[in-house]
Amino acid sequence: MAVYVVTGKLGAGKTLVAVGKIQDKIVSGCRVATNLDLRIHKLPRVGIFAKSPDVIRIPDKPSLDDLLAIGRGNNSYDENKNGLLVLDECGTWFNSRSWADKERQSVINWFLHARKLGWDIIFLIQDLSIMDKQARVALAEHVVYCRRLDKITIPFIGSIYSVITGSKLPLPKVHVGIVKYGDSPQSMTVERWTYTGRDLYAAYDTKQAFSDAYEHSSFSYLTPYLSHGRYAVKRDATFYMRLTRIYLKKYSRVLCLFCGFVSAFTYLSLSKPEATPQIKPVTTQIITSRYKPSELRITTSYRMGNAVGFEFMDAKKQKIASDDLIKDGFRMVYITPCSVELIKDGKHEKVTC
C-alpha cells in the first residue's frame, strides 16, 4: 500500500496534484473515494462517454461508518489495482488533540489497516508539522512537497526583466510534486509529479469549503456517460450539415461580400482587352558581292599537289587572289589551269584567262 501526505502552501497545487492522481486511477479502471467535489466528465482523459468510472463522494470529515461503507478498493493481491482514497483538509484530523480523541481513534485505526482493504491513500495537509508525530510515523510513508514554478524567479534574468518592465518575469504555471520516501525533507526523492493544471481546473471545485456538518452521506457519482454522454449530440453527417448551415446563416453577409469581391476580380481579369501584338518590320539586308565574276579573268594559276591557286584581275586592273574570293563566299571548282568555275548563292559562272 502507498500512503502519500501531500503538503504545500495555499495555492501550491495540492488538490490539483491529487485530482491528477484520481484521473490516473480512473483511467486504469480502479476505484476512487474522496471528499472532493469532482466533475468527472471534465477530466480530459476520461471524457463524457466513459461508462466505467467508480467514484464515491464521502463526507468532508468521514466517520468510521462512512469509511466502512466504501468497501474494499481491490479484491486481488495486485497492489497496482488498489483503489485510491483522497482526503483534503486533514490538518484538523491528525493534530495532537484529534489524535488522542477517542471518537476519531476508530477512524485512525481504519487508516492504519487500509492496506488490507486494498486502498492507497492521499492525505492533503498544508504543512507536515501540523500532523501529530505518531501519525507521521505511522502513516506518512511518502511525503509530497508541492511547488509552483511560476512563483520562482530566475536569477539574474528575472532581475533584469523586473528592472526593465517593473513586473515579475512571467513563467508557465506548472505544478511539481516532489515525492520523498519518508517524513524528512532530506529523505530520498523517489519520483516527481508534474501537472500543468490548465486541463484539470474544471474537474473540481477550487473554492470548495469543508464543514464538520456535511449534510449528505456517502454516494456514488454517476458515470460521465449517464450524466452527460447520453445527452450529447451525435456527431454524424447530419450534425455537421446542420452546423454548416448555422455558420453559413451567421456569416452570410460576410460571405456574400467576399464572393462579390472575388466575382468582380475574376470578371475584370477575364474581360481585360488583349494587347494587340506589334509587328516589327523585318529588314532584310541584301548583301552584295564585292566581286563580279563576269569582270574577272585569270592572270596566274598554280598547282602544288592538291593545292590550287589563282590570281585574277578585274576591269579596273586590280589584282584579286583566290583567297579573297573564298572570303567573299565564293566556292571555286578547278577545271584547267586557265579555267575555273565560281559558285555563289546557287549561281555558276566560268572564268577563263
Curated annotation (Swiss-Prot):
Membrane topology reported for the UniProt record: Single-pass membrane protein
One Pfam entry name: Zot
Places the protein is found: Host membrane
GO cellular-component term (any): membrane
Keywords: ATP-binding, Host membrane, Membrane, Nucleotide-binding, Transmembrane, Transmembrane helix, Viral extrusion, Viral release from host cell
GO biological process: viral extrusion
Record InterPro entries: P-loop_NTPase, Zot_N
Keyword NADP: no
Binding sites annotated in the UniProt record for ATP: 8-15
GO molecular function: ATP binding
Transmembrane segments: 254-270
Family of the protein in this entry: Belongs to the inovirus G1P protein family.
Function, in words: Isoform G1P plays an essential role in phage assembly. It is required to increase the number of adhesion zones between the inner and outer membranes of the host cell. The extrusion of neo-synthesized phages occurs at these adhesion sites. May be involved with G4P in creating zone through which the phage assembled and extruded. Isoform G11P is also involved in phage assembly, probably playing a structural role in the formation of the phage assembly site.
Subunit structure: Interacts with G4P; this interaction results in a complex that spans the inner an outer host membranes.
UniProt-recorded name of the protein: Gene 1 protein
The encoding gene: I
